[in-house]
Amino acid sequence: MRKSHVLVLAGILLLLSPVLSQQKSLKVVLLYDMEGVSGATSVRHTDFGANPEYEEARKSLTADVNAAIAGLKAGGATEIIVVDGHGSGNSQGPDVLEAELLPPAKMISRDRSFDIYMDSYDQSVDAIVTVAMHAGAGNPAGFLSHTYTIEDIQYRVNGTPFNETMIMAMGAARFGIPIIMVSGDDQLEKEIRRYLPWIKYASGKRAAGRTKAEPFPREEVSRRIEKAAREALLALDTARLPENFPGPFRFALTFQDESQARTVAGLQGAELLADSVSVQIRSVDFEEGYRASLRLISAAGLVGRVQAMQRVLTAQPNAAALRDAVSKYITDRWLDPQPAPPAPGGAGAPQRYWGAR
């Protein structure tokens, strides 16, 4: 090949290099929750029972998610996997209006439940964004603030208060995957700025306490989310992982009362702390410690629900009769066990799981 031809070919490749670089495959996981939806201003907006507020919030959620999809696509994403992080997906379908998602986004569903913070991604993913998230437990100013459970159990790792976005960030760090963009209320933004300040953030509303929020205008929110998602993906090369990864790790859970803490003390190696309402477990592996903490939360949650039922029961005018009925049911089930009833719907289509727990 002549030298002149080599120079011409080199010039063509130089001209094409921006185009070729833009065609690089970029896979992004988009996980959404619902408390941080721009249009969700009361707890009924997040309750997937049959109520008009929930259906209204689904439309707002879809607008938030689509704004992020548009931004990611503009930033070069070639594959966008959407994960339901609110929990409704395990009962009736995803919270988002799946048929209205913009391309190239696709929902994932599986034939068994999976943990959204540990199991919704693998090494093939380049980045993660989380949409419509909320502040963590212990933040009294955050709209519907909690971490993993509405039992209001405060969750700390190595002394740092954790919200669910931070759990996701630590889980993804196992594979070197960064969270690059988050949306939610202004209280979550403060938490993210404090602990993960390099992440792009789009605020959709102002929290007015735990039970109320003041949304920003719809078009403004969509612009914010789209811009943050686009800029975050374009700056992927500068993305960072949480600084305290790898461990070892101390997972501390602070419960609402002492009975919950004492119930789980000793389980999963948990030790009761001096305040008598907190327990702590240690792990050299984040995922292992996280999954152990969930088992403690589940056990404590049973205690909390039983206590709540007892208090409600006691307040009823026919409390004694109700207690007798419960006692009789338990005794009858013990002495005369009956076969389990058939599953609703018979042997129809298998259960599908879109995401959260």
Regions found by a protein language model. Name each.
Residues P161-A265:
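Glycine-rich, Lys/Arg-enriched anion-binding loops that position phosphate/diphosphate groups
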Residues I80, V221, A228-R357:
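C-terminal accessory domains and tails appended to enzymatic cores
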Residues V8-P18:
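Bacterial N-terminal signal peptides
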Residues T46-A67:
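Short catalytic helix/loop segments, enriched in acidic residues and glycine
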Residues A105, Y117-R174, P178-V182, Y201:
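Divalent-metal (Mg2+/Mn2+/Ca2+)-assisted nucleotide/phosphate chemistry catalytic cores
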Residues V19-Q23:
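Boundary at the C-terminal end of the N-terminal hydrophobic targeting segment
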Residues M1-V8:
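Bacterial N-terminal signal peptides that target proteins for export
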Residues K24-L26, A40-T41, V65-Q123:
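Glycine-rich nucleotide/cofactor/substrate-binding loop typically near the N-terminus or early
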